[in-house]
């Protein structure tokens, strides 16, 4: 997963918070 913090996009492939599970935010 890529995209943490300010550069995070709310897509199923981005990690919005901490670690990514099942490819969802």
UniProtKB/Swiss-Prot annotation:
Disulfide bonds join 1-16, 8-20, 15-25. One of its GO terms (molecular function) is calcium channel regulator activity. One of its GO terms (cellular component) is extracellular region. It is found in: Secreted. Expressed by the venom duct. SUPFAM superfamilies: omega toxin-like (SSF57059). The modification Cysteine amide is found at residue 25. Its main location: secreted. Keywords: Amidation, Calcium channel impairing toxin, Disulfide bond, Ion channel impairing toxin, Knottin, Neurotoxin, Presynaptic neurotoxin, Secreted, Toxin, Voltage-gated calcium channel impairing toxin. The presence of a 'disulfide through disulfide knot' structurally defines this protein as a knottin. The cysteine framework is VI/VII (C-C-CC-C-C). Belongs to the conotoxin O1 superfamily. Omega-conotoxins act at presynaptic membranes, they bind and block voltage-gated calcium channels (Cav). This toxin blocks N-, P- and Q-type calcium channels. It shows high activities on Cav2.1/CACNA1A (IC(50)=11 nM) and Cav2.2/CACNA1B (IC(50)=7.7 nM). In addition, it shows a higher potency when Cav2.2/CACNA1B is only expressed with the ancillary subunit CACNB3 (IC(50)=1.6 nM) than on Cav2.2/CACNA1B expressed with the ancillary subunits CACNA2D1 and CACNB3 (IC(50)=12 nM). Both the Cav2.2/CACNA1B block by this toxin and the recovery are voltage-independent. This is Omega-conotoxin CVIB. The lineage of its organism: Eukaryota, Metazoa, Spiralia, Lophotrochozoa, Mollusca.
């Amino acid at each position: 997963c890529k995209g943490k913090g300010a550069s995070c996009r709310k897509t199923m492939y981005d990690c919005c918070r901490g670690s990514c599970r099942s490819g969802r935010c």
